[in-house]
Regions:
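Alpha-helical transmembrane segments and adjacent TM-loop junctions that form the membrane-embedded core
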Residues: 2-15, 19, 42, 48, ...
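The first (N-terminal) embedded transmembrane alpha-helix
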Residues: 20-30
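Short, hydrophobic transmembrane alpha-helix segments
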Residues: 33-44
Length: 297
């Protein structure tokens, strides 16, 4: 018997995405215009990078919208998996962007390019405010939603890059050391890569139906086996339906009294304690001869 408990529906991130897309689009126009007027390749390159951020936000936003669509005959779990794929895309996009910045920075270390320090600093200061504001829009939802976490990291990474650009520009204006620009870019890129790698690992794990990192499968199995009337279990599977919803299915060898009361109690406990929204329990009066070996994921 399957029970669906949506005790904690995902937050409506529509307003956050609207503001973030609007702010980033405006900044791309500003930065691209400043780069074209000053002839700064650095600003033009960063404007192109921020344009990919807008694309990433639009994909994450679209996935969040799809996740709320009702189930259909063809998509019986709904389209929540789109949020996992969006998080995976964002992680890859961040890593690719960081790799491109690092490659360009390494090239410039051997042949530093003079940059218009004051103009770059002013544009970067605006970028700090815009990206920090965008990141804060997703801050509260990032812990419970990997899709929101991907958007948050995208914006936080850009804010960090803008901060590094300000420091580098200030240093160049004071010392005249043009190599500070690529050196700082490399340092920040490495820090961002570490965080993005964690997002990529988790998103890839979930996209392959892995048990969400915050759920202890062994502990749940132990808890189920200790319930009244349970003689054993097999085929325990836990997998993500989206970045915010999880499903569980298990066969229980059970010799209790009222099956409906037992199922209600167990499904409520799993929903409240572990946030597992959809639970399917198959009760068996004796061990099933066709039981498959439990697969730990």
């Amino acid at each position: 018997m399957a029970h669906d408990h949506d005790h904690s529906p995902p937050a409506d991130l529509g307003p956050a995405f609207r503001w973030a897309v609007g702010l980033n689009t405006g900044y791309v126009i500003l930065e691209g215009t400043a780069g074209w007027i000053t002839g700064s390749l650095a600003l033009l390159a960063d404007a192109a990078h921020n344009l990919t951020d807008v694309a990433g936000l639009l994909i994450a936003w679209g996935a969040a919208v799809l996740a709320k669509r009702a189930v259909t005959e063809r998509h019986t779990w709904g389209l929540g998996r789109a949020t996992i794929l969006a998080a995976l895309f964002n992680a890859i996009a961040i890593l690719v962007g960081v790799g491109a910045v690092t490659w360009e920075a390494v090239q410039r270390l051997s042949d530093p390019v003079a940059v218009p320090g004051l103009t770059v600093m002013l544009v970067a200061l605006i970028g700090i405010g815009m990206n920090t504001g965008s990141a804060l829009l997703f801050m509260s939802a990032r812990k419970g939603d990997l899709n929101a976490k991907g958007a948050f990291l995208h914006m936080a990474a850009d804010a960090a890059v803008s901060g590094a650009v300000v420091l580098a520009a200030a240093g160049i204006m004071v010392t005249g050391w043009d190599w500070l620009d690529p050196a700082v870019a490399i340092a920040v890129s490495l820090l961002i890569a570490v965080t993005a790698a964690g997002l990529f690992r988790e998103a890839l794990h979930l996209s392959l139906d892995g048990v969400p990192f915050e759920i202890d499968r062994a502990a749940i199995a132990d808890w189920l086996e200790r319930q009244d009337g349970v003689q054993g279990l097999h085929d325990l599977h836990i997998w993500p339906l989206s970045t915010t919803r999880t499903a569980l299915a298990v066969h229980l060898v059970w010799q209790g009294g009222d099956p409906d009361a037992f199922i209600d109690r167990v499904t409520d406990a799993l929903a409240n304690a572990h946030g597992i929204a959809n639970v399917t329990l198959q009760l068996e009066r004796r061990p099933c001869d066709r039981a498959h070996a439990a697969v730990a994921s």
